[in-house]
Amino acid sequence: MRRLDDVLAELRVDRVDFIKLDVEGAELSFLRGATSVLNGKSRPAILADVQDLRTEPWGYPAREIIKFLSQAAYRWFALGAKGSLEPVSTDLAAYDANLVALPEERITEFQKMLEAPRSSL
């Protein structure tokens, strides 16, 4: 397995805006291999599948994903009705949801994007 930081360096990618994280329980391993991205100047939003059912076979509870990104100054949200961001508690006993983790400094930016009028198709 290769670390995201190593792959991005090899490909000379200097900016990642969004990560969809669904690796069937290996989320924490993935995040540990992405510390340069998570702590860089342009930190990505993350949509993560956070489920104890998936993480327990890997030997950790899903709340460790929550804790890891919270310690990196990310805040957790569920997407509510009409795309609103609903804060999620970081101290629940168990998790089973797709959640959004946003860097603290980009929360307002994402709220504005979600509130922007959508063009009709």
Predicted features and spans:
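Short internal loop-to-helix segment that lines adenine-nucleotide cofactor pockets
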Residues: 1-41, 54-60, 64, 120
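Short beta-strand segments
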Residues: 17-20, 47-49, 100-102
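Short glycine-centered segments of the SAM/dcSAM-binding site in methyltransferase folds
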Residues: 43-45
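Active-site beta-loop-alpha junctions enriched in small/polar residues
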Residues: 51-53, 82
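Binuclear metal-ion centers of metallo-dependent hydrolases, dominated by the metallo-beta-lactamase
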Residues: 60-121
